């Protein structure tokens, strides 16, 4: 059993900002129900680019719910540009830490803000070459892998799997040549 911080317990048992957001003008989705973690973020952004409100829906564990909850608290009142600077480390720090096997939950929260901001700005994330999906099972993109490795100074395949869930299921993406 994992040891969770008081902040994780609080955000899991009493999550903030849960449910669809009426009037949302940006929505981001990450994860996959097939892998057991999925997150949908709703943002209401002013004409000046300030996030006025944020809510979420998630399917996942205590860490996924807590990461999503704390993210919505963090982004309220921020400009979209400042929200895009939030990393999974910021989310983890706000929660007082997460077990290494649950770091992928903070990465999902970090990734979803980029998806919502892209929708708000009218950018088709699927059109980006960097958005090539590397792990189909966990729906992890090459761009996300590169950033998470850089931000967290990851060195091993096991660390990458803990942080992203890439390679946790069918394992074809970690074999030479991939799928």
Each model region followed by its residue ranges:
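Local cysteine-cluster metal-coordination motifs and their immediate loop/turn environment
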Residues: 58-70, 100, 131-143, 164-179
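Polybasic, low-complexity association/targeting segments
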Residues: 1-21
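Active-site- and interface-proximal helix/loop "cap" or "latch" segments in soluble metabolic
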Residues: 35, 44-110
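Structured beta-strand/loop patches that form or line metal/cofactor-binding pockets in enzymes
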Residues: 14, 18-48
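Amphipathic, charged-and-aliphatic alpha-helical interface segments
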Residues: 73, 139-152
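Short, charged, surface-exposed loops that flank catalytic or proteolytic processing sites
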Residues: 79-82, 153-157
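Immediate flanking context of iron-sulfur cluster ligation sites
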Residues: 49-59, 125-132, 154-169
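Stable alpha-helical structural segments in soluble proteins, enriched in small hydrophobic residues
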Residues: 109-123
């Amino acid at each position: 059993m994992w040891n969770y911080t008081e902040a994780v317990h609080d955000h899991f048992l009493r999550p903030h900002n849960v449910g669809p957001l009426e009037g949302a003008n940006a929505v981001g989705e990450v994860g996959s129900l097939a892998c057991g973690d999925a997150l949908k973020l709703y943002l209401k952004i002013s004409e000046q680019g300030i996030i006025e409100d944020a809510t979420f829906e998630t399917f996942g564990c205590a860490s996924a719910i807590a990461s999503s909850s704390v993210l919505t608290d963090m982004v309220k009142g921020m400009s979209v540009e400042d929200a895009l600077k939030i990393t999974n480390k910021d989310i983890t720090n706000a929660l007082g830490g997460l077990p290494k096997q649950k770091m992928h939950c903070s990465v999902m929260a970090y990734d979803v803000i980029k998806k919502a901001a892209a929708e708000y700005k009218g950018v088709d994330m699927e059109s980006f070459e960097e958005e090539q999906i590397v792990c189909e099972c966990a729906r992890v993109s090459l761009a996300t892998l590169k950033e998470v490795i850089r931000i967290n100074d990851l060195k091993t395949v096991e660390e990458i799997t803990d942080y992203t869930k890439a390679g946790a299921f069918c394992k074809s993406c970690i074999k030479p040549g991939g799928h």
